A protein has these predicted regions:
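Acidic low-complexity segments
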Residues: 1-77, 84-90, 94
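Low-complexity, Gly/Ser/Thr/Pro-rich intrinsically disordered linker/tail segments
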Residues: 171-232
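Active-site nucleophilic cysteine motif
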Residues: 62-66, 96-111
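A local structural micro-motif
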Residues: 78-79, 119
């Protein structure tokens, strides 16, 4: 049996360059709560956040300090299934090794711990000739609204010595994105009957029958960019 779907969407990705001097003293408090079992303000994370941020009170600069820490200290590594990890940020920070999703949820957790609203996003990195899975984060600073942080791509740029690209990925994304998930560890709609392969991240969905879930080696999936055009 073959199941297919074609999705059309538009992406507006204006470049922003927020300045700390323009940040409001009063900031919102939404999306600053814990979300167990991974977005949890443990004693270790509280101590680390204090070490990273110090006495900084400017929301934009707090987020930048967290971004700088992750992108300059950590490197990309493939991960075991998230389902097997008790606490993703602590796992990542214990060795400063992890994939794009681990880096994103660590950024979200540290931002929230420091009072900066932050959310998870994941989906596809869709260049005109290819499409692949990717995760990133976004954070909210008034008066600018939602800004992006791609710690994985930013860290890669930093290690390559491309500081312009490193700075770009704090606040911005290029237009090669198709977000499919804007919340971490959320249920599908309609909900799954059986245990998910990954109950936290979702980039391309999962498969189940009426009687059981299907494992990755039991089906094939293929994602392609059919057409890409610049809009006026």
């Amino acid at each position: 049996m073959t199941v297919s779907a074609e999705i059309a969407y538009e992406i507006d990705a204006p470049y922003v360059q927020p300045h700390a001097r323009e940040v409001y003293a009063e900031q919102p408090v939404f999306d600053t709560e814990e979300l167990p079992p991974h977005v949890v303000f443990t004693p270790y994370l509280r101590a680390l956040a204090k070490e990273i941020v110090g006495d900084e009170t400017n929301a934009l600069l707090k987020a930048r300090k967290i971004y700088d820490f992750i992108t300059t200290q950590a490197v990309y590594r493939f991960m075991p299934p998230y389902l097997t990890v008790p606490n993703i940020p602590e796992y990542f920070l214990s060795g400063l090794r992890g994939d794009c999703g681990v880096q994103a949820i660590t950024f979200v957790t540290l931002c929230r711990l420091c009072g900066v609203p932050a959310q998870w996003q994941s989906g596809l990195y869709t260049k005109p000739n290819s499409a692949g899975h990717h995760d990133w984060a976004r954070f909210y600073v008034a008066p600018f609204g939602w800004l992006f942080a791609d710690c994985s791509f930013g860290g890669s740029a930093y290690r390559a010595g491309d500081l312009d690209r490193w700075n770009f990925y704090f606040g911005n994304l290029e237009p090669w994105r198709m977000p499919t998930c804007s919340a971490f560890q959320q249920e599908f709609n309609p909900p799954r009957r059986f245990l998910r392969h990954d109950p936290y991240d979702n980039q391309s969905g999962e498969v189940e029958s009426l009687t059981r879930r299907l494992y990755a080696d039991e089906y094939e999936d293929d994602c392609r960019v059919v057409r890409y055009e610049e809009m006026e």
